């Protein structure tokens, strides 16, 4: 059998140019002067041209790897969503008195405070610990925090438990999407990261569903918090069978284990093509890890800030994280029970299913289209929907609350039509959030070079939690001072500013490999360069494909001629049309 692969020829031609450098990496020694990404004719080896059999398919092993990793997303969602339905059930169980609004805000903010430390510490040390160990440490904090909260009999104890839990939430929020980004094949990377992103609203939906079912159960809030320990224990068990990120293994010089991981991710690929994939990863690792050689942590931080490409990429993902919080969506999660109770629903916890369910549905839609429409494409389509939803809420709350002076009054029975209009606005608003920020903020690792990927993810996620803290501790107070319309008007203003940033400063990563995306910010914010790189990639692959088809046709007709079979021009045209239409494969039996 003769199979024509332009990718094979392209990389064979590259092999001799890079032998010395690659051998240095394989020996775990690296090189004294790693080449810059532009040192190889302007580019390193293009991963998109190293095509592996079955690369665009999700295998059972990849499903297991992604699902086990995404449990961290479920824990993130469950433990941030559960507080909104659990706190109204506490009653007088914590000190004999009902929780006031200040205590609710502090308890809610406890997880956010812990998450700030968790994302900063585990994100900053993610390269040294490894992705796998960082996730396992997060699971320990998840489990211990859940036990402390479920056994609480005082407000200080539950706050401590929420802070401990928050460390796990923050660490998982950084490391899980980072781990998935570094292990998933380029062709399906968007969907794989999307699974973790979907598990976040799915966890919130599960928390709301269980909360609705334990409304009349004595101590039901304890059960809600205790159940959070179950997924973390499951992930602790499953991660025993999962590998370390192959790129971290390469950094540590463990090339054999990295090769084994690639072989399991691409089970139908030949050893030769797996080695090509490994070589691509080694080239980028060697070219992008010079920052970590012989410098202290603070020296690296200083260098990161002074290097324009690093600084711009971290700012870009940090702004997107902040935008996902400052649009106000998480107020619907944290205070769902309180808000829908004020709206007059008899079962506030059941009302919390509305934003959680809507979010989950539209995250599914977003993650299923992200590799086609793109990250930036979804933002440009979905954020305007979110903005219109905020305008809808502003108008809806204004007219609904007119009889009570613009403020929400728990003792007043609001007109059901106006309540329905507000709920409709919330659904529309959440739909826009689900299509965009709910999952796209967790693609942050795609935009960061390997040497700053863990640190940058930690910074961006820390920004996320700081913004979350600001919103969560001020929401109830804002409702009481600024009115609901004023509160959502404030969120609208911040969201418009964020959207302007997205339009001018947030590039597309669709069709680019995880190692190529870090090159976008070399000279500017990369919006135009992203378009140019993807256009060049498309044209290059098209040229290679045309050459491949022509060679396949030539081989076919050479075989026919050897059998003394005549070939007409019409038959040649028909054969080429079949190749281009995908009806024939570019391989020939001779």
UniProtKB/Swiss-Prot annotation:
SUPFAM superfamilies: MFS general substrate transporter (SSF103473). It catalyses: myo-inositol(out) + H(+)(out) = myo-inositol(in) + H(+)(in). It holds the Pfam family Sugar_tr. Residues 1-40 are annotated as: Disordered. Induction: Induced during sexual reproduction. Expressed during infection. It comes from the Eukaryota. Keywords: Cell membrane, Glycoprotein, Membrane, Transmembrane, Transmembrane helix, Transport. It is found in: Cell membrane. It is a multi-pass membrane protein. One of its GO terms (cellular component) is plasma membrane. GO terms for biological process: myo-inositol transport; polyol transmembrane transport. The chain crosses the membrane at residues 58-78, 106-126, 133-153, 158-178, 193-213, 223-243, 326-346, 350-370, 377-397, 421-441, 456-476, 486-506. Coiled coil: none annotated. Glycans are attached at residue 100. InterPro entries: MFS_dom (IPR020846), MFS_sugar_transport-like (IPR005828), MFS_trans_sf (IPR036259), Myo-inositol_Transporter (IPR050814), Sugar/inositol_transpt (IPR003663), Sugar_transporter_CS (IPR005829). GO terms for molecular function: transmembrane transporter activity. Belongs to the major facilitator superfamily. Sugar transporter (TC 2.A.1.1) family. Transporter for myo-inositol. This is Myo-inositol transporter 3. It comes from Cryptococcus neoformans var. grubii serotype A (strain H99 / ATCC 208821 / CBS 10515 / FGSC 9487). The gene is ITR3.
